[in-house]
Amino acid sequence: MQPQYQMGYDRAITVFSPDGRLYQVEYAREAVKRGTTAVGIKCSEGVVLIVDKRVTSRLLEPVSIEKIFKIDAHIGVASSGLVGDARSLVDRARVESQINRVSYNEPINVEILAKKLCDHMQTYTQFGGARPYGTALLIAGVSDGEARLFETDPSGTLLEYKATGIGTGRPAVIKTFEDEYQEDADFSGAIRLGIKALHAATEGKLDVSAIEIGVVSIETGEFRKMEKDEVKAYVDQFEE
């Protein structure tokens, strides 16, 4: 049972505790930590996103679980946490992207889009009558010929990474990347490293049907999700 003095701060989003904490934001972060593992890796050719969709029942169709989304031709995101919250943010990101195209006749800059999403997420930590988003996003894209990878969290914090992970397996992913990440790796090397990180995060319980991969290329400036046979080929290479 919670101490009496703490319960009021738990219930109010906009009230700081005496030690400077917003408990509801911290609880939203816990929702992300319980989510499926997603990784993002920048490489010499672009950015790779890989997600373990965690199929919890053999009766479940893996294709019905979507954790990587295309936002615009040059941007994709991976999510961890509450799927419904992620879809809401994805829809908002798509609208912001189209508004930019209509207003300025050019694709939106990846960093600008990431900041707009984080500004929106931050407002849900500052006003009553709503709760923080219980999801985190990895935003990958190409702007001005440069690969970019950003991570958001429920507080509205925005950070840029060379390689990172979100979700339940984040500690194992970060350790793998810190030990083995190389900036000059190509798509193939980055994907193999990402699968290795997921393998560590899932304690060796990789299921090829639950792996989703998206890549955004510097050369073409386009984001795409890989087909099942492409994903299977990379997983098979890793397991050999």
Curated annotation (Swiss-Prot):
Predominant place of localization: cytoplasm
Gene Ontology MF terms: threonine-type endopeptidase activity
Top-level taxonomic group: Archaea
Activity regulation, per record: The formation of the proteasomal ATPase PAN-20S proteasome complex, via the docking of the C-termini of PAN into the intersubunit pockets in the alpha-rings, triggers opening of the gate for substrate entry. Interconversion between the open-gate and close-gate conformations leads to a dynamic regulation of the 20S proteasome proteolysis activity.
GO biological process entries: proteasomal protein catabolic process; ubiquitin-dependent protein catabolic process
A GO CC term attached to the entry: cytoplasm
Keyword presence, Cytoplasm: yes
A Pfam family assignment: Proteasome_A_N
Listed InterPro entries: Ntn_hydrolases_N, Proteasome_alpha, Proteasome_alpha-type, Proteasome_asu_arc, Proteasome_asu_N, Proteasome_sua/b
Gene3D superfamilies linked: Glutamine Phosphoribosylpyrophosphate, subunit 1, domain 1
The entry's keywords: Cytoplasm, Proteasome
Bilayer-spanning residue ranges: none
Function as written in the Swiss-Prot or TrEMBL entry: Component of the proteasome core, a large protease complex with broad specificity involved in protein degradation.
Family in the record: Belongs to the peptidase T1A family.
Subunit structure and binding partners: The 20S proteasome core is composed of 14 alpha and 14 beta subunits that assemble into four stacked heptameric rings, resulting in a barrel-shaped structure. The two inner rings, each composed of seven catalytic beta subunits, are sandwiched by two outer rings, each composed of seven alpha subunits. The catalytic chamber with the active sites is on the inside of the barrel. Has a gated structure, the ends of the cylinder being occluded by the N-termini of the alpha-subunits. Is capped at one or both ends by the proteasome regulatory ATPase, PAN.
PANTHER family: PROTEASOME SUBUNIT ALPHA/BETA
Name of this protein: Proteasome subunit alpha
